[in-house]
């Protein structure tokens, strides 16, 4: 009989239990992360209304189109707000990030002059123009809510 057997069995059992515990924790953390990702809203979840986008079009035409163009294709000094370039530039960021950029830096000749509702309307128009679907509830105007909505090119 092996003289180390009495101490080996408890050690092996302890290692086995520890291995199971680590596996369970890792699996649980992975499942929770996947659930959190699945629960996150994106621009593909109908985060604005068609009415809000129509209101945003009017604001855009009045305050933004001079620089960004009627087709949102950008200009000499202005980035495009439509198409693959726009989505690529903002993919992985939140609608809140875009809201903050517009609110604090636009329009270029009068930064910060748009109120929160106008910025949300313009955002709704930009999203609509980029073929993201409208939904039943309007896009909110607060950073906390907007920060929970991701911009992505994937549905």
Q: Model-predicted segments: where are they?
A:
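Bacterial N-terminal signal peptides
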Residues: 15-30
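Electrostatic cytochrome c docking/interface patches
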Residues: 34-59
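Flexible coil segments in periplasmic/lumen-exposed cytochrome c-class electron-transfer proteins
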Residues: 40-41, 109-155
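The canonical Cys-X-X-Cys-His
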Residues: 56, 60-70, 122, 126
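Generic structural signal for alpha-helix termini and adjacent loop/cap motifs
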Residues: 70, 104-105, 129-132
């Amino acid at each position: 009989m092996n003289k180390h057997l009495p101490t080996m069995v408890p050690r092996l059992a302890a290692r086995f239990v520890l291995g199971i515990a680590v596996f369970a924790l890792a699996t649980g953390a992975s499942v929770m992360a996947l659930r959190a990702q699945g629960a996150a809203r994106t621009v593909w979840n109908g985060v604005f209304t068609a009415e809000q986008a129509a209101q945003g079009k009017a604001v855009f035409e009045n305050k933004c189109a001079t620089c960004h163009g009627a087709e949102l294709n950008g200009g000499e000094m202005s980035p495009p707000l439509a198409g693959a370039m726009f989505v690529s530039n903002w993919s992985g960021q939140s609608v809140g990030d875009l809201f903050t950029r517009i609110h604090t830096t636009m329009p270029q000749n009068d930064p910060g002059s748009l109120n929160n509702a106008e910025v949300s309307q313009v955002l709704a128009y930009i999203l609509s123009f980029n073929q993201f679907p409208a939904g039943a509830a309007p896009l909110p105007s607060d950073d906390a809510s907007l920060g929970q909505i991701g911009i992505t090119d994937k549905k």
